[in-house]
Amino acid sequence: MKSIAVYPGSFDPFTNGHLDIIRRAHPLFEEIIIAVAINSKKTSLFSPEERVEMIGKVFHGWDKIKIDTFEGLTVDYCKEKNSRVILRGLRAVTDFDYEYAISLMNKKLAPEIETYFLMADNEYSFVSSTIVKEVARHGRAVSNQVPDVVGEALVKKFSV
């Protein structure tokens, strides 16, 4: 069976922290699906289509990387894609508490699916999509926290 990892998230926007997790996980799997979650109950800065397009540009030319969208439970999406691994990044203890609880529920729902946690590199341990949006909204540079294509999109969004 092909080793496929699903890296789910809203990625609104995609950050260098997300990129670092993918870069480090890339050699470990035959395929990584970056699964952009669609949550109609949340107001997003970027549409799912915009997020997929930006992430696609970030990973242009990379082998083994696919970008997709999904709604519903991550474990159901994993089953649909024949993946037995959910990939998650952890920045701090607060991330661990939240992610651990979700991984336990996922294990109850789908015992065959494992959650793999990668610790954030120190350089990215403070970076979050929420913080990046807030800083960019106030006209400050976020170029060290996001890939270039995302930084350009943020400038366009907030310079209207």
Curated annotation (Swiss-Prot):
- Which reaction is the catalytic activity of this chain? (R)-4'-phosphopantetheine + ATP + H(+) = 3'-dephospho-CoA + diphosphate
* MF terms in GO: ATP binding; pantetheine-phosphate adenylyltransferase activity
Instruction: Name the positions where substrate binds.
Output: 10, 42, 74, 88
EC number per UniProt: 2.7.7.3
Positions marked as site (Transition state stabilizer): 18
Query: One Pfam family name from the record?
Result: CTP_transf_like
Instruction: Show the stretches that span the lipid bilayer.
Output: none
Amino-acid biosynthesis is among the record's keywords: no
Question: Which keywords describe this protein according to UniProt?
Answer: ATP-binding, Coenzyme A biosynthesis, Cytoplasm, Magnesium, Nucleotide-binding, Nucleotidyltransferase, Transferase
Name the enzyme's class: transferase
Give the residues the record marks as binding ATP.
Answer: 10-11, 18, 89-91, 99, 124-130
InterPro entries attached to this UniProt entry: Cyt_trans-like, PPAT, Rossmann-like_a/b/a_fold
Part of which pathway? Cofactor biosynthesis; coenzyme A biosynthesis; CoA from (R)-pantothenate: step 4/5
Q: Which NCBIfam families match?
A: coaD_prev_kdtB, cyt_tran_rel
HAMAP family assigned to the protein according to its UniProt record, in alphabetical order:
PPAT_bact (MF_00151)
Subunit composition?
Answer: Homohexamer.
The molecule here is called Phosphopantetheine adenylyltransferase
Record organism:
Leptospira biflexa serovar Patoc (strain Patoc 1 / ATCC 23582 / Paris)
